Amino acid sequence: MPERGAELYQCEGTQNLWSDRGRIRDHAMIGCLKLRAMHLNLRRRSMVAKHLESNNIPGPRKFMAGPWTCSRWQGAIFLLICGLSGVIPSARAWAKEHVDLVVAHGTLVTMDPTRRVFEDGAVAIQGDTIVAVDSSAKIDSMYEAGKVIDARGALVLPGLINAHTHMSMSLFRGLADDLSLDDWLHKYIFPAESRYVTRDFVTWSTQLTLLEMLRGGTTTVADMYYFEEEVAAATKAAGMRGVLGETLIGFPSPDSKTPADGLAYTESFLKHWKGDPLITPAVAPHAIYTCSEELLKDAAALARSNQAPLLIHVAEAPFEIEKSRQEHGLTTVQYLARIGLLGPNVLGAHCIWLDQADVQTLAHFGVGCSYNPSSNMKTAAGVMPAAELLAAGVAVGIGTDGAASNNNQDMFEEMNLAAKQQKFARMDPKALSAVQVVEMATITGARALHLERQIGSLEVGKKADLIVVETSAPHATPMYNVYSAIVYALKSSDVRTTVVGGKPLMEDRRMLTLDEPAILANAAKYAAQIKASFGAKSN
């Protein structure tokens, strides 16, 4: 009889094979053992090897050192031998592999390189990583899950990527509207920030934004603001993924009296969060019109020395281009290229006022861009040449910008407006298709943030960031094309479940990591204070 443990790998009808009754059956048994070994951990493999050695069964030693593979004809021969010899693998031999989570029975929109869509698809997740993407039937036959999320009647998408916002500005939502960007910034926002922005303000405002984004299907956010230590702590506690940039600016800010203080704070921030699984710390010089050339160069050097992303507003409004031409004789993009700031670690927000040379320069340096249609429309800043940038090979993501200039964090609304704005601006209904827009909110947005190897699509080996979006509402019925439905019909309120790194953060619309009543209560408290002292209009 085999030693203890060998019965785990035995096959029905082979009880007498251990006495080496025939070469054919021996090799059939070896085949069973080989196939089973593909799914065993190292401890079990060693048990199989020990059994084979003790019974003098020849030939299978090599497969114990690593995964065993066979060609189709070898597999066919093995199955034929099994049939001739009466050797049939038992149910125990083909036991399912355990995984932590399976999301099943939804219409799976993978956004992988071939843009596969499974009508009844499933994703298997172990830890924070996707281990399988296939039909629900196939996943069910292979895996046993600790938890199953039933996605019937819904789409399963990669989590949405908000490529540009200012999370801590949500408490300024509606404070100053219907203004030009220049007036909005200099007459209202900068004064309000100097007066109200504190660590506590940033913490609660960030949590308010995280609450809105998770409810709307955003799983990764690129943020620029002050007190990013607090932003990072709140984001990590909520379980969201973030590329978070500490803002550098050329005048006293809420967390730094001088640019030198800001650089020191930023360097400490980079070192503190480096290597975190959810938080990617970044350097964020505000813009060329608020930062000196010296500060811009120092910011670029700091980002490079720490291998960190750099986030910056680029060519957002006409006044910026005029200022750049007057002071430097160059466009914003050409000026940034001249001083050595551009590179593959850079994300430029807005990128509206570009000429053809600017587009080619951004492509040459591998710069990512964020398209923020709502904010740009509201401040009449202009329309990004998104189609031209994409055609040149520039990775363009979609962002909301801060709630103070938008006034929400709704990525479904941004997708809808992105497609329609491009069509209207060019008088071309084919400009920026629904598929392209979904790409911009997922895999191309990941490219813009230089995170495409980790997120942006539902593929084996990538982080398990996904959302479940209901399609049963009247506004989503019927659904002939999933991409058209996502861009033109679905709403953020249709998001049912949000998963980041394999962890459900919202399930069946119930928040699991954020205290919604406390967040809303604190938001109301701050709003009352700001309205009383700042004189925000009530009508």
What feature does the model see in each segment?
Residues 42-44, 53-77:
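Bacterial N-terminal signal peptides that target proteins for export
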Residues 51, 73-81, 87, 91-121, ...:
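Active-site microenvironment of metallo-dependent hydrolases
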Residues 94-97, 230-352, 357:
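Metal-coordinating catalytic core of metallo-dependent amide/deamination hydrolases
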Residues 171-204, 241-263, 318-345, 365-368, ...:
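Active-site gating loops and adjacent loop-to-helix segments of metal-dependent hydrolytic enzymes
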Residues 173-240, 262-275, 524-529:
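Alpha-helical scaffold segments that flank or form the walls of functional sites
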Residues 338-345, 387-473, 488-491, 503:
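His/Asp/Glu-enriched, well-ordered alpha-helical/loop segment
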